[in-house]
């Protein structure tokens, strides 16, 4: 296991709720604040971190306020017809073309940037550190929520789906790799705990083509709440600070 330095920044995903961490990271950029040794992002959190490491304040706010709301991105009709609810291919193509990403800034930063993904064939979490050339595809994989996005994203011959399925907030992994001072940017208020899924049978049926994902999808709440317990009661010698949205945040 690759060891990292002591100071880690972890950014939770959460679709549109990622606008909260986006705002914090934009402020960090304005203040030139980046005292971290490693970066960990899942789903929308990975996308926000990419803009932060590319030093592009305001970039992802445009995605939340404009591109994410366009009919090209979310299409229930397409999903009913057997396609994807979210067109991640369109999202990455159009935003890379119109907003760009500073590849040279990303390449110049030697600090590891881990993207949390879930293997489609066994439901296990993996933490990938892609090259700049593979970053967009890996971010797409980290955001490919099963059911909403039907077939996962293939990276080096392996299919992956949203990292939030197996490990939504990779605090334990960061600790295992040597992080002792951890900041977590959350997408949910501090009081939030994930509930058991309401439609277990429906989820199982919709995932019949990917049986290895059924159990991880139905037990997400258990792992998520265990991570919250770890954040609130870290092991001796580990300091964890979480920054959460206000209680009314939806």
Where are these regions (language model features)?
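Gly/Ala-rich beta-loop-alpha elbow adjacent to hydrolase catalytic centers
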Residues: 41, 45
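Patatin-like phospholipase
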Residues: 1-40, 50-250
């Amino acid at each position: 296991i690759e060891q990292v330095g002591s100071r880690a920044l972890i950014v939770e995903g959460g679709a549109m709720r990622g606008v909260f961490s986006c705002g914090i990271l934009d402020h960090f950029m304005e203040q030139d604040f980046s005292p971290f040794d490693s970066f960990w992002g899942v789903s929308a959190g990975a996308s926000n971190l990419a803009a932060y490491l590319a030093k592009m304040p305001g970039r992802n706010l445009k995605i939340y306020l404009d591109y994410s709301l366009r009919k090209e991105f979310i299409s229930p009709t397409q999903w009913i017809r057997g396609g994807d609810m979210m067109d991640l291919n369109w999202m990455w193509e159009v935003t890379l073309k119109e907003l760009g990403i500073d590849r040279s800034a990303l390449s110049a930063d030697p600090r590891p940037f881990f993207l949390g993904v879930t293997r489609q064939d066994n439901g296990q979490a993996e933490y990938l550190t892609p090259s700049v050339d593979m970053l967009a595809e890996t971010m797409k994989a980290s955001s490919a929520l099963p059911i909403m996005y039907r077939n996962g994203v293939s990276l080096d011959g392996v299919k992956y789906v949203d990292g939030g399925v197996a490990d939504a907030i990779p605090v334990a992994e960061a600790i295992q790799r040597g992080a002792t001072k951890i900041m977590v940017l959350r997408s949910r208020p501090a009081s939030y705990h994930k509930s058991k899924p309401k439609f277990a049978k429906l989820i199982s049926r919709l995932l019949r083509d990917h049986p290895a994902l059924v159990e991880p999808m139905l037990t997400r709440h258990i792992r998520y709440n265990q991570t919250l317990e770890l954040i609130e009661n870290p092991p001796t010698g580990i300091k964890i600070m979480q920054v959460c949205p206000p209680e009314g945040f939806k």
